[in-house]
């Protein structure tokens, strides 16, 4: 349940002839119910955490987890997901928009839609049909974007099929006119490329066998709260969730505040670079 031990915890360093420094960058607890971790296991986790030369986390919930399992001795800073620096670090890997449009048969204005095949995460086919009709009236092509191991739920006129390389996946989001769906990393890509989005947030700590969900632990909610973009999100993983209408969601895309995204992305890129400088200093490497 708590994934211990795995390489994440750095126990493998005990088997090396010469110790190496271990840094933990923008870690996330994935909505772990860490307060139920047995005391003996928490003690082992604490020893691992305190041996890191650097640790940072991706959200406030993970920060609280680290503080809890270390009895307050480690309260790591919240730092950006590394994907926020993709354009800085790997823009040369991206194909052009013209190439993406040609290979995937896309129009100049396409909207990506991606829902997990889970009744607590997805929307109905009727909802998708209405969204597609609205988009078509505005000259926008609706396109189904798959997950890494499965296709998106529902049917649209156009679908991106698997296999799909990570670089093409990123480029598809970067060049789109919008994204609607689940998961965090599409939102991260949209934010730092100022692409309009609406998140059906499927993260959070579930209670009462999934009847209720505490979305305060959501990684998406944390990012959008900091970016002041919570109006582009709805919690989607509770049985009692409220599903916004397709017209409401499409209107949110049309009135999306791109300037706010640009400003936030610049702040987060600066924080990312500061984090990397600190990591290199701690592990004794030259950051240049």
Name what the model sees in each region:
Residues 1-288:
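Active-site anion-handling motifs in enzyme catalytic cores
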